[in-house]
UniProtKB/Swiss-Prot annotation:
Mg(2+) 2 binds at residues 302, 306. One of its GO terms (biological process) is defense response. It comes from Mentha piperita. Belongs to the terpene synthase family. The Asp-Asp-Xaa-Xaa-Asp/Glu (DDXXD/E) motif is important for the catalytic activity, presumably through binding to Mg(2+). It catalyses: (2E,6E)-farnesyl diphosphate = cis-muurola-3,5-diene + diphosphate; (2E,6E)-farnesyl diphosphate = cis-muurola-4(14),5-diene + diphosphate. This is Cis-muuroladiene synthase. SUPFAM superfamilies: Terpenoid cyclases/Protein prenyltransferases (SSF48239), Terpenoid synthases (SSF48576). Its EC number is 4.2.3.67. Mg(2+) 3 binds at residues 445, 453. GO terms for molecular function: magnesium ion binding; terpene synthase activity. It comes from the Eukaryota.
Length: 551
């Protein structure tokens, strides 16, 4: 016992193996950007004029298929927010009308997906007419690529109990992957290619919009008005993003943390990408900036616990942060004083912003989520450094916090008009929508972390916990986690619609859904991490902020 005590005591003074993070790829790329206000105003006026024509098109669409196809195109092009009232009006018309018995697979699936994505209750029984007596989709459907794609996209808004939609995923993926697409229109080919990588419902909305604009302009059946509007709109937003990013970069550079805390990541641009993913629409400037700052706090904390602090230092930092008192800073090592000041100062600015925006009630909650996150990071560090393997259930409970979902949501509350104190009370109850979206990110991160960290054999990951508890191989555990991702998405889909019963607005529900979407795009299909490894996020940064759209 005495020997064990000495070992544990010594272990608490050991620093974790330090990962040398790649430097920022962007340094001063955006900090000196200057927006031409006159040109931006001209774009705004052009958008308004084109919107009037597009609105007329939408309201003139009379048949359900015309309405659904146009709404789908507007959403794919990143334009639907301009017509929110009109789109919801049309969606309600589509929902109120009985489904046309003559709807083919394409139309049936499109209607089903759009209604669910707009939080309407619609039964998956609408697909019964396409299955045989054994409950299998009819093989005659396999030659209808457009219908298969529509069903594939619709199947990804399913719930756990909807077995027909899981069958639809398997059926459509099998046939789409094996389809001869050479004779299909370019638009269909490109949609299929992207969908097999990232189903539309799970895709990064504004990144997809940028991609779809480039596909749409090559389509012979394109609408020139919508194409022009989408290009001017994207150019307008791209310049707005670059302006915000320049302001954020200058703020970040004043702290000079990349030299003061060399163990920490310098990822201001990557953090801002997440902000754009949460809400890309122009009116959500505070959400984008606020989330980026929240993520930078999280990143500094994560790297401090995971990449540098000893167990004793981490425990002390957790205690000091819990007191939230500058007078306590003298108890900390010098490098931790810098971290502590960065957190407190950023939160003080948040508190002032919240007061100006009529959201003073948000500040105490934001502080509490930061403290909560510190405790969860500290627990995770103990498990790893002391090589303890918690039960999978204990891991999941702690991971709901280290997913950072609560801190990230709290960081943007001042920029969300619909959030009230009642919203915060709802989130504090840890609703399924919040916990499930958080776990999507956690599961994908754990899969990638295991592939990265186990290469060096130094760090324990969540897959190690699962392998030991259930006697699985690494491959089996990774497969199990990917299965957990799929099932958790089904919970998100169900709760996204159910929030309409909790008096939780669409703005809030979309925020949580978009967190899961960004995680899916950032972590899946790779062993990289779009925040840890700048090369993973590079394509999104270039598409959103660097590449100019060609008119």
């Amino acid at each position: 016992m005495a020997t064990n005590g000495v070992v544990i005591s010594c272990l608490r003074e050991v620093r974790p193996p330090m990962t040398k993070h790649a430097p920022s790829m962007w340094t001063d790329t955006f900090s000196n950007f200057s927006l031409d206000d006159k040109e931006q105003q001209k774009r705004s006026e052009t958008i308004e004029a084109l919107k009037q024509e597009a609105r007329g098109m939408l309201m003139a669409a009379t048949t359900p298929l015309q309405q659904m196809t146009l709404i789908d195109t507007l959403e794919r092009l990143g334009l639907a927010f301009h017509f929110e009232t009109e789109v919801e009006y049309k969606i309600e018309q589509i929902n109120a009308a009985a489904e046309d018995d003559g709807f083919d697979l394409f139309a049936t699936a499109l209607r089903f997906r759009l209604l669910r994505q707009h939080q309407r209750h619609v039964s998956c029984d609408v697909f019964d007419k396409f299955v045989d007596k054994d409950g299998k989709f009819e093989e005659s459907l396999s030659n209808n690529v457009e219908g298969l794609l529509s069903l594939y996209e619709a199947a990804h808004v399913g719930f756990r109990e909807e077995r027909i939609l899981q069958e639809a995923v398997n059926f459509t993926r099998h046939h789409l992957e094996g389809a001869e697409l050479d004779q299909s229109p370019l638009l269909i080919r490109e949609k299929v290619k992207r969908a097999l990588e990232h189903p539309l419902h799970r895709d990064f909305p504004i990144v997809y919009a940028r991609l779809f604009i480039s596909i749409y302009e090559k389509d012979d059946s394109r609408d020139e008005l919508l194409l022009k509007l989408s290009k001017v709109n994207f150019k307008f937003m791209q310049n707005l993003y670059k302006k915000e990013l320049s302001q954020l970069s200058r703020w970040w550079n004043t702290w000079d943390l990349k030299s003061k805390l060399p163990y920490a990541r310098d990822r201001v641009v990557e953090a801002y990408v997440w902000g754009v993913g949460y809400h890309y629409e122009p009116q959500y400037s505070y959400v984008r900036m606020g989330l980026a700052k929240g993520i930078l706090i999280i990143g500094i904390m994560d790297d401090t616990y995971d990449n540098y602090a000893t167990l004793n230092e981490a425990q002390l930092f957790t205690q000091v942060l819990d007191k939230w008192d500058r007078d306590e800073a003298d108890r900390l090592p010098e490098y931790m004083k810098i971290v502590y000041e960065f957190i407190l100062s950023t939160c003080e600015n948040y508190e002032r912003d919240a007061a100006k925006l009529g959201k003073s009630f948000a500040a105490p909650y934001f502080k509490e989520t930061v403290k909560q996150l510190a405790r969860a990071f500290n627990q995770e560090q103990k498990w790893v450094m002391e090589r303890q393997l918690p039960s999978f259930q204990d891991y999941v409970k702690n991971s709901e916090k280290t997913s950072c979902i609560y801190t990230m949501f709290a960081s943007i509350i001042p920029g969300l008009k619909s959030v009230t104190q009642e919203t915060i009370d709802w989130i504090k109850s840890e609703p399924t929508l919040a916990t499930s979206t958080g776990m999507i990110g956690r599961y994908w991160d754990d899969i990638g972390s295991h592939l990265r960290e186990s290469k060096g054999g130094e760090m324990l990951t969540a897959l190690d916990f699962h392998m030991k508890e259930y006697g699985l191989t690494k491959e089996e555990a990774a497969s199990k986690f990917e299965g957990l991702v799929e099932e958790t998405w089904k919970d998100i889909n169900k709760e996204f619609i159910a929030t309409t019963n909790y008096n939780v607005g669409r703005e809030i529900a979309i925020t949580f859904l978009n967190y899961a979407r960004i995680c899916e795009a950032s972590y899946s299909k790779t062993d990289g991490d779009a925040y840890l490894d700048p090369n993973v996020a590079k394509a999104n940064v270039v598409a959103l902020f660097v590449d100019a759209i060609v008119f």
